Amino acid sequence: MDATVSAASVIAAALAVGLAAIGPGIGQGTAAGQAVEGIARQPEVDGKIRGTLLLSLAFMEALTIYGLVVALALLFANPFV
């Protein structure tokens, strides 16, 4: 494998994981904060808010996992070689 392609793949993998974690991390923090605020305002809808929050957190975390899959593909099954 060419050294330049190998180095570029490692950098791309690092960027894939890093950038894929930034958006969902910010979104999860915002969603959790808003959920706590909503539960504090209306404690009677605690179960509905918590269920919706957990489902949305799972969807956001899937984006990070997709970034990890792309990074692993770049590192171990390099399509550029």
Swiss-Prot record:
TM regions (residue ranges): 7-27, 57-77
Membrane topology according to the record: Multi-pass membrane protein
InterPro entries: ATP_synth_csu_bac/chlpt, ATP_synth_F0_csu, ATP_synth_F0_csu_DDCD_BS, ATP_synth_F0_csu_sf, ATPase_proteolipid_c-like_dom, F/V-ATP_Csub_sf
Molecular functions per Gene Ontology: lipid binding; proton-transporting ATP synthase activity, rotational mechanism
Coiled coil (UniProt feature): none
Keywords: ATP synthesis, CF(0), Cyanelle, Hydrogen ion transport, Ion transport, Lipid-binding, Membrane, Plastid, Thylakoid, Transmembrane, Transmembrane helix, Transport
Cell compartments where the protein resides: Plastid, Cyanelle thylakoid membrane
Residues at the site labelled Reversibly protonated during proton transport: 61
PROSITE patterns: ATPASE_C
Domain of life (superkingdom): Eukaryota
GO cellular component: cyanelle thylakoid membrane; plasma membrane; proton-transporting ATP synthase complex; proton-transporting two-sector ATPase complex, proton-transporting domain
Record flagged with keyword Transport: yes
NCBIfam families to which the protein is assigned, alphabetical: ATP_synt_c, PRK07354.1
Family, per entry: Belongs to the ATPase C chain family.
Function summary: F(1)F(0) ATP synthase produces ATP from ADP in the presence of a proton or sodium gradient. F-type ATPases consist of two structural domains, F(1) containing the extramembraneous catalytic core and F(0) containing the membrane proton channel, linked together by a central stalk and a peripheral stalk. During catalysis, ATP synthesis in the catalytic domain of F(1) is coupled via a rotary mechanism of the central stalk subunits to proton translocation. Key component of the F(0) channel; it plays a direct role in translocation across the membrane. A homomeric c-ring of between 10-14 subunits forms the central stalk rotor element with the F(1) delta and epsilon subunits.
PANTHER family: ATP SYNTHASE LIPID-BINDING PROTEIN, MITOCHONDRIAL (PTHR10031), ATPASE PROTEIN 9 (PTHR10031:SF0)
Quaternary data: F-type ATPases have 2 components, F(1) - the catalytic core - and F(0) - the membrane proton channel. F(1) has five subunits: alpha(3), beta(3), gamma(1), delta(1), epsilon(1). F(0) has four main subunits: a(1), b(1), b'(1) and c(10-14). The alpha and beta chains form an alternating ring which encloses part of the gamma chain. F(1) is attached to F(0) by a central stalk formed by the gamma and epsilon chains, while a peripheral stalk is formed by the delta, b and b' chains.
HAMAP family: ATP_synth_c_bact
Protein name, per record: ATP synthase subunit C, cyanelle
Species of provenance: Cyanophora paradoxa
